[in-house]
Amino acid sequence: MFQGASSLALDTKGRLSVPTRHRDVLSATASSQLTITKHPHGCLMIFPRNEWEKFRERIASLPMQAQWWKRIFLGNAMDVDMDATGRVLVSPELRQAAGISKDAVLLGMGSYFELWDAATYAAQEAEQMKGEMPDVFRDFSF
């Protein structure tokens, strides 16, 4: 399970360095193979390959009404390998789609990661924190 936030800077080739605390898990559970695709909230999702296969099957089984979402998730997916130093290449197309040029935030979201442009994430988080919590949290104890 992945959790926590990491501030990262992509290098000039568009590579991100996976935080050390996640590298061993990714090497052991996914043989350093990852899949990156678009997220509807404007970030990217990064899946260990085994988790991507589960997600891909769920998306592929959706009815025809979801065809455009299938295209967004599956049609934009890119398989990548983490190199020996823990770097992953994020394609120019995916970086552009998420507005990521250099500074980014990697969020562990359980079975996958979200990769955000740092400024976009900070603005979105601040906006959410100003509003009311969703009703699903009404009976949730903190």
UniProtKB/Swiss-Prot annotation:
GO terms for biological process: negative regulation of DNA-templated transcription initiation. Residues 5-51, 77-120 form the SpoVT-AbrB domain. It is found in: Cytoplasm, Nucleoid. One of its GO terms (molecular function) is transcription cis-regulatory region binding. It comes from the Bacteria. Keywords: Cytoplasm, DNA-binding, Repeat, Transcription, Transcription regulation. One of its GO terms (cellular component) is cytoplasm. The keyword DNA-binding applies. Its main location: cytoplasm. Belongs to the MraZ family. Forms oligomers. NCBIfam families: division/cell wall cluster transcriptional repressor MraZ (TIGR00242). This is Transcriptional regulator MraZ. It comes from Polaromonas sp. (strain JS666 / ATCC BAA-500). The gene is mraZ.
